[in-house]
Regions:
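Bacterial N-terminal signal peptides
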Residues: 14-25
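Well-ordered beta-strand positions in beta-sheet-rich domains
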Residues: 77, 103-105, 118, 297-301
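Long, low-complexity serine/threonine/glycine- and acidic-rich segments characteristic of extracellular
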Residues: 158, 163, 173-308
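Secretory N-termini
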Residues: 92-97, 103, 113, 300-301
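Bacterial N-terminal signal peptides that target proteins for export
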Residues: 2-13
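A short macromolecule-binding patch
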Residues: 102-110, 147
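Surface-exposed, glycine-biased beta-strand/turn segments
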Residues: 26-94, 99, 120-124, 130-135, ...
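Acidic, glycine-anchored pre-beta loop/turn
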Residues: 110-123
Length: 310
C-alpha cells in the first residue's frame, strides 16, 4: 500500500466524522453497561449495523441491526444505564426515555417495571429471557438510532483490533466477474469486510464478527494521484435508512450465528464508469475502520483498457 494513501484515507474518515458530529450534537453523553459489573467492558456478539434477515408473513425482510447484543447468561439482571421514565413496556422489552429526547431500549428481558415508572440510574429493569443469552441495547435520539459503541457512549469500551478486508471483487453492473487486468466501462466493487470483537463472546458465539464502522475506497493512478474516492458505508454514529440495505449489503450477507461467524459483503462501489479515465494501471484500495479508528486495508491492481473512441 503506498504510504501517501493512508493520510488521504484518514482525512476522509475524519472529515466524515466531523460532519456527522456537527449534525448530531447529542453524541457526547456517556453511560455505563446495563449488566454488572457496570464499570467493566463486556463481550458483544452482535454489532450495530450488521445484516439482519428474517422471514415473516409478508416475506423476506432485511434491516440493519439497530443496537448491540451484549452477551449475558439467561436470567442475568439488566439495569438502567440512565435515569428516566419507562415510556414503553412489552413482554420482552423496556424503553426508558429522557427529557432530552434520548431513549434506551432493553430487549429480550422479562421486565420488572411498569410503563410510566420513574427509574433511577442502575435500577433493576428485568432479567434476560430464557434462550436468548444476551440483552440487546439500543440507543436513539428523537427517533434516530445511535451507535452505542461510538466514542463517548457505552463506557468503558476499548478496541485495538484491526478490521479485515478479506477480499475485493470487480464486477460488471449485472454481476459478472471482471478480469482486473482488463477493465472497461462501468464496474461495481464488492468486498468482504469484518472487524474482530475486542472481547470474544462465550461459545457458541465465540466466532462472532462485527460490522465495520466505516468503509472507504480510492482509485489511484500509477503516478500516485487519487482519481476517485468515497465513503461507502458509515455506521460510526447512526444508521442509514433500511431502504438502502441492498445498496450497502450484497447478497449472501448474514449476521453471526452459533458456531458460525457472520458474512459481511459490501457494495463498495456502484457503477464506477472508467470510460472517461486514461487507460493504464491503477490501484483500487478498500479500507475499513472501527469506532476507535483502527484501520484495515487491502488493494487490487486494475488495468483500464477501454477501446479508443472512433
Amino acid at each position: 500500500m503506498p504510504a501517501d494513501t493512508v493520510p488521504s484515507m484518514r482525512v476522509l474518515l475524519a472529515a466524515a466524522a466531523l460532519a456527522t458530529t456537527l449534525l448530531l450534537p447529542d453524541l457526547a453523553t456517556a453511560y455505563s453497561w446495563p449488566i454488572k459489573p457496570f464499570g467493566s467492558p463486556h463481550a458483544i456478539r452482535g454489532s450495530f449495523g450488521d445484516p439482519r434477515f428474517h422471514l415473516d408473513a409478508e416475506g423476506a425482510l432485511s434491516a440493519f441491526h439497530f443496537g448491540v447484543d451484549i452477551a449475558a447468561r439467561d436470567g442475568t439482571a439488566v439495569y438502567a444505564v440512565e435515569p428516566g421514565v419507562v415510556v414503553r413496556r412489552h413482554a420482552d422489552s423496556v424503553t426508558v426515555g429522557r427529557p432530552s429526547g434520548r431513549r434506551y431500549g432493553y430487549w429480550h428481558i422479562r421486565p420488572v417495571v411498569r410503563s410510566g415508572t420513574h427509574v433511577r440510574l442502575h435500577q433493576l429493569l428485568g432479567h434476560v429471557l430464557p434462550g436468548w443469552g444476551h440483552v440487546h441495547l439500543a440507543e436513539s435520539f428523537r427517533g434516530s438510532y445511535r451507535n452505542p459503541l461510538r466514542k463517548g457512549a457505552l463506557t468503558p469500551y476499548s478496541d485495538h483490533t484491526l478490521p479485515t478486508v478479506e477480499w475485493i471483487r470487480v464486477l460488471t453492473p449485472l454481476g459478472a466477474p471482471v478480469d482486473p487486468s482488463v477493465v472497461t466501462g462501468p464496474i461495481d466493487i464488492e468486498a468482504s469486510i469484518y472487524d474482530t470483537p475486542p472481547i470474544a463472546p462465550p461459545a457458541p458465539w465465540n466466532l462472532a464478527r462485527f460490522a465495520p464502522a466505516q468503509v472507504w475506497w480510492s482509485l489511484t493512478g500509477s503516478d500516485g494521484v487519487v482519481v476517485a474516492s468515497s465513503l461507502a458505508v458509515n455506521f460510526q454514529f447512526g444508521l442509514p435508512s433500511n431502504g438502502l440495505y441492498n445498496w450497502i449489503y450484497a447478497a449472501g450477507s448474514y449476521q453471526n450465528k452459533p458456531h458460525r461467524p457472520g458474512e459481511y459483503l459490501y457494495w463498495v462501489v456502484h457503477g464506477l464508469d472508467t470510460t472517461g479515465m486514461p487507460n493504464g494501471s491503477y490501484t483500487l484500495e478498500v479500507g475499513a475502520v472501527d469506532t476507535r479508528n483502527n484501520l484495515g486495508t487491502s488493494s487490487v491492481n486494475l488495468t483500464i483498457a477501454n477501446a479508443a473512441a472512433g
